[in-house]
Every structure is written in structure tokens, then in C-alpha cells.
Amino acid sequence: DRNGNLYKVVSERQSEAAKRALNRKKDRRHFSFANMRNIREVIAKLSTTDCGRLLVLIGHIDFKSGILVNERGNAMTKKQIQKTVGLSERAFRDFFRKMTEMDVIQETADGKYRINPDYHFVGSTDSVEVVKAFSSAVRKLSGRLRPAELGFVYKLLPHVHYDTTMICADPFETDPCKIRFYNVKGIAELVGMDEDAARRVLNKLRKAGVLAETR
């Protein structure tokens, strides 16, 4: 903020401890990986709002098959994808065409839909150049934040330090002394927003439990 405070993504361990008392029945370990290098290509081509709609869909990636699924675990139809991202038929047609032309959304041989695994994938990996997106957490955020605010979150994903979860310019740096952390001004420039607007979104994300402010 104006005092130079920094921001970090709240770790899954921290967030789960707080959420466990709310609902013990749901499996909150279902997640997909975001390839931190590759999604920069997506971010460069999509508006912040469309990045937010993509994040909404990430919350519906089946943790076994990688297919987009509805609340019942069945493969999503195109109509269900439209409803999930909250667009009119005409607006969705433009959105879906853009996403398929960019090869972000793919149709499988059996007519199902998935997010291109070059960007978001399931399974296991030894790479440190990934960040986990927990399905339950993403779905919860989708109900609390507007698409543009979700897009703000998505644009931060390539900048989450793999060890500290701080928002920084060099997320794969192993020497703590060399990590260049972002303050609110740096984050504003990163997401293409003026500083006051970025501060308002950061405050909302902090209250939603997505980010923590550090000094």
C-alpha cells in the first residue's frame, strides 16, 4: 500500500484451517495446476474480465479427467458453460469463439470440453513452475467477486513465489535476498490498473481471504 506493504497469497493450509469448521463434508483437496509460464500467453491476449471468466471455469475442472464438469460431476454442455460464466447468448458466442480460437478451451474427440492442459492441467508434476487452483476455493470466490476482480486474481498467478507465496517479479528465485516483491503500485502496473483502483480490489481480496498483507 502507500506504506510499501507487500501482498502474499494465503496458503491452502491457512485457508483450509479457517474453512474446515464451515463444511467438513466437501473434499477441498481437488485441484488443478496452472502452468505459470504458459498462462502469461493467455493473460497477454485476454481482457481482465475474460481472465476472470476463465478462472471461473478452472473451478470446474474435474480433478481426474481434466474435463469441465457441472456440480453433479457430469461433463458440461456448451449451454452450461454459458450459464457458469454468466453471459448472454450473444456475448457468450463471442467469448467462446475467442477461447477456442486461442486454443484455451478445447473440444475432445467425444464432444466434451476442457481447458488446454498446456495452461491448466490435472495429475501430478515435479515442476515448481506451477500454482495450484483448488476447485472449492475458486468456486467460492466466483460467488463473491465480479469477473473483473477474478481476472485480477488470475493475472497474479504467474507472479506467486513458489516458496513464500508472495507476489513478486521473480517467482522462481531461490535466493530470498534477490526476490523483488511487488507493493500495491507494482501490482497495479502488473494488472494494468491505476493505483487507487488496485488498492480497492486488493482490500476486497484481503477481506475475502485470498491475499494477506505483510509488512
What is each model feature region?
Residues 63-113, 166-215:
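Winged helix-turn-helix DNA-binding recognition segment
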Residues 1-71, 117-178:
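Short recognition helix of helix-turn-helix/winged-helix DNA-binding domains
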